[in-house]
Design a protein with these regions (language model features):
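Membrane-embedded alpha-helical bundles of multi-pass transporters/translocases
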Residues: 1-505
Length: 506
């Protein structure tokens, strides 16, 4: 049994926090920069977020194959983590500062450089994010430890992503808004430093485990070509179901937490963005704490599938209440608006439904990531191949293809109601915003959660099943280390009842 030390479980997920710093910046603010600072067209700015997310998805399988083929003195995953972060640093400086040096009279060059630097950033981002999903396979294969990876992964995300979300409105208010160059002059260097520190911690976390003895069951790893991806995906039904579940969760998150949507909800509709955004964000995080503890306990006792299904269902039920409250909202009527002083019944109900719903959802938002490791171990059990890079990037391929729609959907929805500049905290209410917020903030996440529940219905990698898979993989690896061929080991041990007692988990 390959078990991780506590510090490794805590530090390696910081890799996800490091990339989420850039992810949330891109998701929420790059369109503001392109439109407000560079003067690029609104639809171009929002559409480019989708186009580059698609490019990110396309590069995933290629980089996944590179990871699986890589074996250096510095390990398999660490080179991609470090190089990816360096590329993002360079590209961010060029993207957010270099493009401003181009004269407004040469707007065509601004468009070209924006696209090129953005594409370079995507390559670096893919290098590093691919390691979060694939690297965990060598960190631990203990079904009781992998749920802990979820909670530490979420904490790491909060450190990176939460820091940006917390500081952004404060800096925006002091530096002229999200459309100002001054805002990016402070936010980008801060993001670079935070991401670099988190990357360093993640490298320390995986240092001892990034070695060949923790890679799969065979001493030699088969090189899989990119063209074989489709066959692998077709054969691995569990990964297919997880893709649907993960993509649905990511789409819900990318749209419902989009800064434009929140500006319309708390600013234009409730007329108090500065007084509501941070408190409501904190409410969601506070409510998520008990759910984190519950998800870990449920995952350790019944498996990660049971935890994901249970708490996604709770989020779905609670958001029915949020939906009803937003439908009942009345402009200018204090009794039907959010207010933290004085507090009304509408606010109390909203905090309860939103807090419990968001808390339940957020506690499971990153759960598909360690579940990818389960699918990777299942692939090793099924075919004998240790291909965590391919498995992780196959998952993120669909994940990114779907979530890439987020900014475009928001941008298109805003354009449909006649708004030509992305709303910020000071934007006044206009006709159509009410319906747009209801759809983007409530209905889209609810549909995504229903997709998740349907996909998980046929998912077979339960807690007990993963114990069987790990036991079979362990006895095969032991036999191969003693001289047996991979083919013979695959044929000799197929089921739990064939496994010697010493390889079985308690």
């Amino acid at each position: 049994m390959n078990r991780a030390k506590l510090y490794q479980l805590v530090l390696f997920p910081m890799n996800n926090g490091a990339t989420n710093v850039y992810y949330i910046l891109t998701l929420n603010f790059i369109a503001y920069y392109a439109n407000g600072v560079l003067g690029l067209l609104l639809m171009f700015a929002t559409t480019m977020v989708t186009v580059m997310r698609l490019f990110d998805a396309v590069t995933d399988p290629i980089i996944g194959a590179l990871i699986d083929r890589t074996s250096t003195k510095f390990g398999k995953f660490r080179p991609f983590m470090v190089l990816g972060n360096v590329i993002m640093i360079v590209s961010s400086i060029c993207l957010y500062f270099g493009t401003r040096l181009i004269s407004g009279e040469m707007s065509w060059l601004r468009y070209v450089c924006f696209v090129l630097f953005y594409a370079l950033y995507v390559i670096g981002y893919t290098f590093q994010t691919a390691c979060t999903r694939s690297g965990q396979t060598c960190l631990t294969n203990d079904p009781k430890q992998r749920p802990l990876f979820t909670i530490f992964n979420t904490v790491a995300s909060l450190i990176g992503m939460g820091l940006v979300q917390f500081l952004a409105p404060i800096l925006s208010k002091r530096l002229g808004g999200y459309n100002s160059a001054e805002f990016f002059n402070v936010m980008i260097p801060l993001a670079i430093v935070v991401s670099a520190i988190l990357t360093l911690l993640a490298v320390v976390g995986i240092w001892e485990k990034d070695r060949p003895e923790y890679f799969g069951v065979s001493k030699t790893q088969e090189k899989v070509k990119v063209k074989e991806y489709l066959a692998i995906l077709k054969a691995n039904k569990e990964l297919q179901r997880l893709m649907i579940a993960g993509a649905g969760c990511k789409l819900a998150f990318s749209i419902a937490t989009n800064m434009t949507v929140l500006c319309m909800l708390y600013g234009a509709m409730m007329e108090n963005y500065d007084g509501l955004y941070l408190p409501m964000m904190i409410v969601g995080y506070v409510f998520s704490v008990p759910f984190f503890l519950l998800t870990v306990r449920t995952s350790q006792k019944h498996g990660q599938k049971a935890s994901l299904v249970r708490y996604t269902a709770i989020a779905l039920v609670m958001y029915i209440g949020v939906l009803v409250l937003l439908v009942l909202w009345k402009q200018g009527n204090p009794a039907w608006n959010l207010s933290l002083g004085p507090v009304n019944l509408y606010t109390v109900l909203f905090v309860i439904f939103f807090g419990v719903g968001y808390g339940a959802y957020y506690s499971t938002a990153d759960m598909p990531i360690p579940m990818v490791a389960d699918c990777s171990d299942y692939e090793t059990f099924r075919s004998g191949r240790y291909i965590p890079g391919i498995m992780g990037t196959l998952f993120s391929l669909v994940d990114k293809l779907v979530s890439s729609l987020g900014s475009t959907v928001v941008g298109a929805a805003v354009a449909m109601i006649g708004i030509h500049t992305l709303p910020d905290g000071n934007t006044l209410y206009s006709d159509g915003m009410h319906g747009v917020v209801i759809v983007l903030f409530c209905i889209v996440p609810m549909i995504a959660w229903i997709m998740t529940l349907i996909a998980m219905k046929g998912y077979s990698l339960t807690g007990s099943r993963m114990k069987e898979i790990q036991a079979v993989n362990a006895v095969r690896k032991d036999a191969i280390n003693r001289g047996m061929s991979l083919e013979d080991a695959m044929q000799t041990w197929k089921e739990m009842d064939q496994v010697p007692e010493k390889f079985r988990q308690s």
